[in-house]
Amino acid sequence: MLTKRQVKILQTIVEEFIKTNQPVGSKRILELLDIKISSATIRNESAILEHEGYLEKQHTSSGRTPSTKGYRYYVDNIMKLDSADYTRLKIYLNQLLDLRKYDIDKTINYASEIISELTKMTAVVIKKQNIKNIKLKKIELILLSEFLASVLFIFSDGDVQNKMFNLKDISLSDLKIAIKLFSDFLVDVKLDEIDQYLNDLKHQLSLSIKQYDYVLNTFINTILESKNEQKETHGMRYMLENPEFNDTNKLKNAVKLVEQLSPFDWFNIAYESNKNMNKIAIKIGNEIDQINDDISMIATELKIGNSSTVLTLVGPKRVDYNQVNQLMNLIIEIINAKEN
């Protein structure tokens, strides 16, 4: 359990680092704190916070930066909604949107563009129609040539979707195994219940074939995107502008994450907010995966009539969580008002 003084120091470091992207030293903390405290005490408390995993020491400077654990503590225990800021942002957003001009879908898309611009984060909007009565009925493999195969997904409403596979990228035997496992787990399952089976399916795939992640994402994308899944992405350019992604490999991993996550993944991120009785889900650093420790995701699910839409913001771990949280709450409020 952190003391009040440690909480204050952690808050100061998080908020200053978000603003400056520079490690925060004891001298700067002393300037920012509104309590009387010595530099020696700040250094001692910062060392304790580092030892407990809330801060990280930067070897190139005397300052410290927040860790994933530090950001998580800030989001869960320190961050508060500022009513004055919220009101100001609400007026600004309503003026920009001019709600009379747009239907709900256009309002969400335009709002996501605005939020992307305000936060300098990438916005991903996934819309899912009501598919509760549609089932996957059959998966078939058609070998077209020595190097090309087609997988057909047949649905209870008569729809058939086709996905081509280059057999240089995945072996025919692995493809056959994947089809068998998908058929065993998902045939005659309603599409809106597929997520209940995916963890077990993924486990079996991982034991049976090499490229199980690729196959899982490709198959699920084909199944769900074919049933009126709509995806809009705004502000990918902001990935290039954030210094966290100056490293080419980190940038590639971030872009790959945004492009390859299946609709199920996006909804699963937002689902956690409903499970925890919160409107907004926040994932930070290695809570997403080990490769993308510099990334954060903030998501909310908007239920509109018979459809659901997930709005997710993706950016560096060093984002203004308070501002993003307020903007996401505003979108929820605006969409609810629009629908009613």
From Swiss-Prot:
Gene Ontology terms describing biological process: negative regulation of DNA-templated transcription
Alphabetical keyword list: Repressor, Stress response, Transcription, Transcription regulation
GO MF: DNA binding
Domain of life of the source: Bacteria
Family under the similarity heading: Belongs to the HrcA family.
Role, per record: Negative regulator of class I heat shock genes (grpE-dnaK-dnaJ and groELS operons). Prevents heat-shock induction of these operons.
Name assigned to this protein: Heat-inducible transcription repressor HrcA
Gene name for this UniProt entry: hrcA
